[in-house]
Amino acid sequence: ASDVYKRQDMTGPTDELCGIRRPGHFRGVCTVVSKLFNIVAPDRAYFGQKDAQQLAVIKRMVRDLSFGIEIIGCPIVREEDGLAKSSRNTYLNSEERKAATVIFKALNAGRYMIMNGETDVSEIISFIKSQIETEPLAKIDYVKAVDADSIEPVNEIKGNVLVAAAVYFGKTRLIDNFIAERN
């Protein structure tokens, strides 16, 4: 009976990253999105990769509840200087806005490490953190590597790995990420 009547308590992909600081947030997201899906009955739904954890949670919900919907992740849209576009960017003063580009630069440096053969997550995360910490206005919430589908922590870059960061600039918390693919 438990296979037919799935209880949607959303553990797993909600337990890491943003879910640590925002307990219950993804339960609310699932409630709103599932109601929308029931009303609209789409064949496809598009979600941004910038909110990669939310994308994974929605994919899991669709699978668990047997919605016949294809969930498609859309690439991160960026400002000219690399900062991920977000409504939160408007809360940054000009100094914080300039400083916030360190997230993209640090993640890109981590991506290059992986492209050059590094697979040890602790080395990659440590390097990304050290790059972000060069910016005095940046306060790291997290920099982590997790399985891109399950959002479970990983120790090695193998398969699809989400490398994600959340960083405060003043009171504004920004998120960004990339997916490393290695078989």
Task: Please describe what each predicted stretch is.
Residues A1-Y5:
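Short, small-residue-biased leader/transition segments that mark boundaries at the very start
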Residues R7-D9, L83-L92, N155-N160:
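Short, surface-exposed amphipathic charged segments that create phosphate/polyanion-binding patches used
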Residues R7-F26:
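Glycine-rich phosphate-binding "P-loop"
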Residues H25-K35, V57:
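Active-site glycine-rich loop that binds ribose-phosphate moieties when present
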Residues F37-A45:
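Proline-aspartate-enriched helix->loop->beta-strand connector
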Residues G48:
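Internal active-site segments that recognize and position negatively charged phosphoryl groups
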Residues D51-D141, V146:
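Glycine-rich, Lys/Arg-enriched anion-binding loops that position phosphate/diphosphate groups
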Residues F127-N183:
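Phosphate/ribose-recognition catalytic cores of enzymes acting on nucleotide-derived substrates
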